[in-house]
Each structure stands twice: as C-alpha cells, then as structure tokens.
C-alpha cells in the first residue's frame, strides 16, 4: 500500500486535530505538489486533486480550542497555497458531503465516501497523461 494512503488512513482515524495532524496535512500537500511538478503519478494526481483539498477543508472548518489562534493563521496560510482549480473541487466536495449527511457522521468517513464516488479511472498502460 502506498505511503500516502497509509497517511490518509491515519487522517481518518484521527479525531482530535493536534499539531502532528496539522503538520501531516502540510507534509502531504508539499510532497504531492513536488511530485506532480516533477511529472507525478496517477495516484498522486488523484490525491492532489481530491483528497488533499478536501482534507484541508476539514482542517479549516474544524474547531481546536487548544490551538485555535495559532492554527487559525496556519489555516489562512494553507488556504492561499491551494491552486484555484483545487479550490473549486474543494467547494464541490464540501457541498456533496454537507447536503448528503443526514446524521452525525464523522467528517473523515464522509469525505472518504464522497471522494470514492467521484468518477476517476486509473491511467491505462500506454496512455499519455494529460496536463
């Protein structure tokens, strides 16, 4: 199982947004962005376009009383680093989960379900990856 998938599962398990959780978001974002700028892979393109923006949204709307002031400014910095195209995906996924949730379900599970119903096909052998 790819390393980033392990990290994403860890994100789903985490209920409390601690400093480690915040820094993991930053690490995933910088790692995937660097990988894509260097050519990237289909798996990392999927994470960059869907998983990472939505996870940042979860981080942005979550309340962490212990770190509220420090994390608040960190969230603003993160928000401005997300490309415009990913911000659009951000809003769409947020609305899909928000409208689709009729009970108190942990947001991580909601995001996982939403992300997995987004149409996406792995790259076929020999197919040229489009920018």
Swiss-Prot record:
Q: Which domain of life is it from?
A: Eukaryota
Q: How does it sit in the membrane?
A: Multi-pass membrane protein
Give UniProt keywords alphabetically.
Answer: Membrane, Transmembrane, Transmembrane helix
Cell inner membrane keyword on record: no
Disulfide connectivity?
none
Further information in the entry reads:
Partially overlaps ERG27.
Protein's name in the database: Putative uncharacterized protein YLR101C
Its taxonomic placement starts with: Eukaryota, Fungi, Dikarya, Ascomycota, Saccharomycotina
């Amino acid at each position: 199982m790819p390393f980033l998938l392990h990290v994403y599962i860890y994100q789903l398990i985490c209920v409390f947004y601690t400093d480690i959780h915040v820094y993991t978001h930053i690490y995933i974002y910088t790692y995937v962005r660097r990988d894509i700028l260097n050519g990237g892979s289909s798996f990392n393109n999927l994470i960059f376009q869907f998983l990472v923006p939505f996870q940042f949204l979860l981080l942005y709307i979550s309340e962490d009383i212990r770190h509220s002031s420090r994390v608040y400014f960190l969230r603003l910095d993160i928000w401005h680093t997300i490309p415009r195209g990913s911000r659009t995906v951000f809003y769409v996924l947020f609305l899909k989960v928000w409208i689709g949730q009729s009970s108190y379900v942990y947001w991580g599970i909601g995001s996982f379900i939403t992300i997995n119903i987004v149409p996406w096909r792995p790259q076929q052998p020999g197919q040229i990856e489009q920018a």
